[in-house]
Amino acid sequence: MSPSSSDRLGYPFSTFLDQHSAQLNASAVPPELWHSLYRKLSDQTFDAGDHFQIICEMDENDEKKTLFVRALEDMHNNDEENIFLIDHFISFPAESARKCVESNEKLPERLAALFGIDDDDCSSDGDETVEKIETSCEKEEEEHARRLSEPGLPRHESVDARLSSYSVDDPKKTMTERVMRNLWKFAQTYTVSYQLENGEMEKKHVWYVMDDFGSRIRHSGCPNVRIVPLMFLPQNCAYSIMFLTKPVKIDDEITMDWAANVITAKNPEWRQYLEMPWAEKDFSSESMVPGPPTLEYFTSGRNPDFLADEKDKKTCESAIFSALSVLKKQGKIKIFLQIFADDTQLTEHLKSRQIEYVDDWKAADVIWMIKHFHDYSNLAQENPCAQINQFPFESCITVKDLLAACAMRDPSKNDWYQLTYNLNTQLPEFVARFQNRQKNGEHNVWIVKPWNLARGMEMAVTDDLNQIIRMVETGPKIVCEYIARPLLFPRPDNGNKVKFDLRYIVFVNAIGPVTAYVYNRFWIRFAINQFQLGAYDDLETHFTVFNYLDKEKVLQMKCEKFVEIIEKTYPKLKWTQIQADINSTIRKAIEVAASEPSPRGVAPNTQSRAMYGVDIMLQESPESPDVIKPTLLEINFMPDTTRACQYYPDFADTVFDTMFLDEIDPTKVTPI
């Protein structure tokens, strides 16, 4: 090989290997193909059309077409030239799929042709390929703004009415809906890592649809090619690369395993469920009820917490009582409160307390940490008079999948928590439930949530089983029954009646029995668009919290004004009763999460206190729209207190008074 061919445009093969060998090894690309891949990427050689052909066949009645790819020649998987580039037609984050599809007026039609759902698709030349569409943030924002400017729909008072409120009579909307229904049969995903401003690494999952050639390759459990994504670093651009896994003969159909992913590898017995987007089966008669979670469910992948023994707990109880007696005299702090903190977002707002930061937690009165603490046994022995803002095994409250596991074991769960499945352990039962509801014509809309991401990232509201199954590929998730009848709020800024949820700050001073208080003021997060059942991937209709690009869309309102408007909008609703029901719901959730011994539940600990952000949504009872019930959404560890400290200058003092000094002010907090 000549030197020039191994050093293309100043980009040598050795550099290619340095930058890409980790990806190639992880994707199991045979090393003998790497140099050909390097050459084709460097020269932008897309030569699949020289070796393969897209075939369109009609059935006997010329009504249904079948699109697939076949080989034009005999080919061997050991031939180093038999590796091929496939371009990506569109790329998008899961939560913005519709926004991407609607960002270009020609895109739905072209995607329909790509997916084989356009009646005119077969009339085109067989060699014709669909042009790659370039979308821009500006076009997406313009389209999004146009949708927001449309007048809102009137308030509907029944589930059936709301189900019919989203119309797709417009041919363009109909085309878009058909595309969205088929998207998850053709989309693939890869992960990119990038560095945040604070130096931490963040991962982002990108979904993409391959070009005309790649999208025509059908699924098979016994494939003859493998297709994997590759991020080509010189261009900062992703491609798919295809290589043979076995020899093929001329006219053989080319197939890939679309269900090949880490979940299938980990749970091979689930393959028939994970293949549902391409090979639908009926599981509606199978069990819909998962078995109880195992002990490993609560411990796998998590650092263990080490508990203090009973003797040390009693020592701590006496030590804390004595320390508080010294700290307080006639209700006023007489000496400095020693604080060990790894985050000062809240503590820097302390005003009525004389504090001093210490570098050693062994010398602290209060340990205030955003980093998870694990060794409570050592804490009790080294600093028995200290109080810490965490409970052992509190992940049973603050991690979505564990909270769901705790909630699902409560017989009264339907009164305060939505039906929830863990897609990483209970997918077969969920598929059975979904198909059973589908057969019976029941409400069948679900919200998919990752365990550990916030602000709407990788969340989806959908009635599409294929989408739910595919979302398992990008990390652990739960799926919850979607609240179809939320209490709506009339936004004064845009006139829309929108979804909202409520953020409460809750202080837990003891577990077993529970001693807890709720901060008397709460925060409201509003959706933007008029609520309707339909277009579930419209984030600004179905989500209340996400990363806002346009800050003007954010409605800030104090809770007193919110209550005034709610009671005026719903004259039969009395907020005092709603608030009492909310308090009961929060207490119930904490009690359930602590109802079993650790690690299946939160453990009591003498030195522990905690502050949680609790998210609540209000929904109408199916039996009567006049009956409003609170539903717990999630509980968050160390919630952001920026707005709390801005709105209420004494908030930080209230936190410390309530949690650590046993000074309970009923004008600020209420026991629950």
From Swiss-Prot:
Domain (TTL) ranges: 332-670
Chain residues that bind ATP: C480, E481, Y482, I483, K499, D501
Gene Ontology CC: cytoplasm
Molecular function per GO: ATP binding
Top-rank taxon: Eukaryota
Database matches in InterPro entries: TTL/TTLL_fam, TTLL12
Pfam families: TTL
Gene Ontology biological process terms in this record: protein modification process; reproductive behavior
Keywords: ATP-binding, Nucleotide-binding
Role according to the record: Regulates microtubule dynamics in uterine muscle cells.
Family in the record: Belongs to the tubulin--tyrosine ligase family.
Name of the featured protein: Tubulin--tyrosine ligase-like protein 12
